[in-house]
Amino acid sequence: MSSWNYVVTAHKPTSVTHSCVGNFTSPQELNLIVAKCTRIEIHLLTPQGLQPMLDVPIYGRIATLELFRPHGEAQDFLFIATERYKFCVLQWDPESSELITRAMGDVSDRIGRPTDNGQIGIIDPDCRLIGLHLYDGLFKVIPFDNKGQLKEAFNIRLEELQVLDIKFLFGCAKPTIAVLYQDNKDARHVKTYEVSLKDKDFVEGPWSQNSLDNGADLLIPVPPPLCGVLIIGEETIVYCSASAFKAIPIRPSITKAYGRVDVDGSRYLLGDHAGMIHLLVITHEKEKVTGLKIELLGETSIASTISYLDNAVVFVGSSYGDSQLVKLNLHPDAKGSYVEVLERYINLGPIVDFCVVDLERQGQGQVVTCSGAFKDGSLRVVRNGIGINEQASVELQGIKGMWSLKSSIDEAFDTFLVVSFISETRILAMNLEDELEETEIEGFLSQVQTLFCHDAVYNQLVQVTSNSVRLVSSTTRELRDEWHAPAGFTVNVATANASQVLLATGGGHLVYLEIGDGKLTEVQHALLEYEVSCLDINPIGDNPNYSQLAAVGMWTDISVRIFSLPELTLITKEQLGGEIIPRSVLLCAFEGISYLLCALGDGHLLNFQMDTTTGQLKDRKKVSLGTQPITLRTFSSKSATHVFAASDRPTVIYSSNKKLLYSNVNLKEVSHMCPFNSAAFPDSLAIAREGELTIGTIDDIQKLHIRTIPLGEHARRICHQEQTRTFGICSLGNQSNSEESEMHFVRLLDDQTFEFMSTYPLDSFEYGCSILSCSFTEDKNVYYCVGTAYVLPEENEPTKGRILVFIVEDGRLQLIAEKETKGAVYSLNAFNGKLLAAINQKIQLYKWMLRDDGTRELQSECGHHGHILALYVQTRGDFIVVGDLMKSISLLLYKHEEGAIEERARDYNANWMSAVEILDDDIYLGAENNFNLLTVKKNSEGATDEERGRLEVVGEYHLGEFVNRFRHGSLVMRLPDSEIGQIPTVIFGTVNGVIGVIASLPQEQYTFLEKLQSSLRKVIKGVGGLSHEQWRSFNNEKRTAEARNFLDGDLIESFLDLSRNKMEDISKSMNVQVEELCKRVEELTRLH
């Protein structure tokens, strides 16, 4: 049964909705704060660029984000209001680097009609009050007292009903607002009001301005000394104050965002709907405004926010394309643009459609999305895990270890790759043709297995074998010194760095050597009570060539110990528990924090934070990476250090926001890895797998990889055709001038290169609404079917459309058949060898007929009326599930004998659907326009017709995201041996660029996780005191109901980021061991 569902985010929202700049984390630091609908990110502006400081979820959809500075404060506070009428004031706590809540509250009213034009939240520049416009005809005031604390809120009646914008004016003795509104004759005006806090009412303001530009949409208040306000229209810009009125015409455009450049407010950046950025200058003599000037600077992504940072650097936040960090130059480039893009921040939003395909044919799903809009439209290929891009490979069996060596210590690149086998050691090097070929290092022993090698100080190399340690010159390649194991002893385990060697011989002997110029000196020897299983002396202190600590893994008592060097004094001993010995230990530092990693023989990995001065270990965490022994090695990529864990499920361990993250590598089993940074293959890795050695470069280190295919137009529908290895898309061309009607196309793309192979233009006013790849009964060909609508300006709903059937021949789209329809073809499905179409309010079934002349046509077989608009359709067997514009979900059945479709059951609630999917025979999933998810159940066991005719709502959840599409599939390799491999998953894509996964869990697992979720709610407090329970409660205009049969995977997986103490609190409340909790939550993270 798919009643118990787990909802988790695989890709966080990336669409930027708000941004602001100020001194938030300290009085001296300049911060950029970015809102991505349900998350906020805090960045620090440094000479090197933006440095992320915090990224946290907000339990609400952010409607307002404003920085302000209450009286007597040295730095700014952050005000956030959410769409569900909650607000909070946040302050930065430098001690814990977290947000503290200064104030919070609920500003909803029992009665009141929510505003059509979105909520407005503004703060008086003198911090006397916060103003909110949430309901038509009401202005809510939250006053500050003189200590900067918030007092009780009250409402003031506002006679303007169609409010477009409200802003506080600067330099007014009493708090004053300017209101831009539209009257009932569609004319636009601005009025000003003083807010009297004493009388809790408005007083007529200092000025008003009637009959503005019909497209006036935005007010920009101007700070002192000039004061007043700018009114931005589609064809004019007006400056207005009590004493002045100036206007200039502009090229027709819709301004979407603005950013103030100077403190005195004389210059503003304006971003329009086409991504053009302008500079608006208020010319003035002292405090008298003399005029306005506007200049085009260049093109950016289509801006939803603009924040001027410093030194001509600007953040452009976008909801329709990638956000950007740009520099405004004094002189234009060759194309006449003053805008230079310094950095791009990927945004998948809005994901209008997507499909799940296995492009590499490796059994791993990739999601290909239709992302962005207008000129910023693109396809994005999203896959989980880190790819290795193979540069060279050679067949080699039985590799036991690998190390790279330089020809001198200060060389930038590696020269040699030492490969060790059971009874020999081979040395490979790059020849002049950039090929790996065998060479010799005369001082190395080649007829034995090498246990360890390393570059050493004084241009030397060190080789450890089972009998000796050899020190060799890297320039002459001759032996300079050798240390022999005592008679009767052999070296079992060894490690080294540039100036130290640590090895263990049988019988628990630990021997420590130091490397001099041509000299190996045995410095210390210790006898331990058990055999040693692994060693590490990777330097993580200030000296890159010398370590003061050694990590030693032990047999028998299954412990890891930290010794000091050179004394070999035991500092710390940590029992690992269990029967499995440590196979690999590693000292490493990520983002300035030192860790000890310890890998066990069964694929588990423990990590500890480590105090390098005392050697003490804390914050122990255990994760399961695979099922086979793991070997750990560090490597660097883009100047950051990461760790590669080689095993049956190779993994890269890295750090982000001071948390350790694990990302799977898209390779089957890897036995050994070492960095190999050669001149021919810079920043590469050498990887030993079953029977071969591969040299390859590694992708950027992150969990999801996103490849962008810019289209320069808006792709609206996509599907993949395996047989022809192509994608079919319906797209809308980007017309530069708005006079022409827009053009729509069906395009064919190669599924590897993503190049356009063929294009079929649709008629004028014809939109592509749906696309499908399918085959028909008694016809072995595979076709692309496209459903269209003629969208005519004078019609409310399309009254005609077409179904087009194409075949791909020699890489071209050939039209085979077309069928006119009496409406828009919103959805197409392959159905029992026929074609099922949703056309306006009806469902229509077509069969594929062969005419006498050998041509083919679609012939209508039967249909079903009874929908408002049948927008989304899914099928399974003979069942058809329909998502309606406003009548929720209904279930239809096709009857073969009668050749008819009839309604079986429906959900009688009024839900405006945005997507549907079938989870199993009886449970159907839907998303609707209030950002909720719901599941309904077919009640075949019902006693009466009435019961059987009702789809019962069994699950409800507030996702807080608008879902455009569900698809069955997975982003991860399905490993048959894991429990997770058996869990069915559905992927969804949203307007804010979220890719999420809904997993249907067994009941026992669901019940366990439900307990964990409620324990976590008590421990993890929402930012700003916002409640998780309220946030996830199903909510529409009519009712609010607690979430049921859906769990929040993002909250559950945040368990892994808690400190050990908090984990233990939860473990006590649930009566389950911390390790067991970690293991079960870890498993879930593998779903995405």
From Swiss-Prot:
- Give the signal sequence positions: none
Which superkingdom? Eukaryota
Ordered alphabetically, the record's keywords are: Cytoplasm, DNA damage, DNA repair, DNA-binding, Nucleus, Phytochrome signaling pathway, Ubl conjugation pathway
Question: Could you confirm whether the keyword Cytoplasm appears in this record?
Answer: yes
Please give one Gene Ontology molecular function term for this protein: DNA binding
Instruction: Please name the GO terms of the biological process aspect recorded for this protein, alphabetically.
Output: DNA repair; negative regulation of DNA-templated transcription; protein ubiquitination; red, far-red light phototransduction
Localization = Cytoplasm; Nucleus
Gene Ontology cellular-component terms for this entry are: Cul4-RING E3 ubiquitin ligase complex; cytoplasm; cytosol; nucleus
Under InterPro entries, the record lists: Beta-prop_RSE1/DDB1/CPSF1_1st, Cleavage/polyA-sp_fac_asu_C, RSE1/DDB1/CFT1/CPSF1, WD40/YVTN_repeat-like_dom_sf, WD40_repeat_dom_sf
Q: Give the metabolic or biological pathway.
A: Protein modification; protein ubiquitination
Q: Which SUPFAM superfamilies match?
A: WD40 repeat-like
Enumerate the Pfam families for this protein: Beta-prop_RSE1_1st (PF10433), Beta-prop_RSE1_2nd (PF23726), CPSF_A (PF03178)
The record's annotation in Gene3D superfamilies points to: 1.10.150.910, YVTN repeat-like/Quinoprotein amine dehydrogenase
Q: What assembly does the database describe for this protein? A: Component of the CDD complex, at least composed of COP10, DET1 and DDB1A. Component of the CUL4-RBX1-CDD complex. Component of the CUL4-RBX1-DDB1-PRL1 E3 ubiquitin-protein ligase complex. Component of the UV-DDB complex, which is composed of DDB1A and DDB2. Interacts with RAE1. Interacts with WDR55. Interacts with ATCSA-1. Interacts with DDA1. Binds to ASG2; the subcellular localization of this complex depends on ASG2 farnesylation status. Binds to KTN80.2/DWA3. Interacts with HTD1. Interacts directly with DHU1.
Write out the similarity annotation. Answer: Belongs to the DDB1 family.
Question: Function of this protein?
Answer: Component of light signal transduction machinery. Involved in repression of photomorphogenesis in darkness by participating in the CDD complex, a complex probably required to regulate the activity of ubiquitin conjugating enzymes (E2s). Repression of photomorphogenesis is probably mediated by ubiquitination and subsequent degradation of photomorphogenesis-promoting factors such as HY5, HYH and LAF1. Plays a role in DNA repair by forming with DDB2 the UV-damaged DNA-binding protein complex (UV-DDB). Component of the CUL4-RBX1-DDB1-PRL1 E3 ubiquitin-protein ligase complex.
Record protein name field: DNA damage-binding protein 1a
This protein's species is Arabidopsis thaliana (Mouse-ear cress)
The protein's gene is named DDB1A
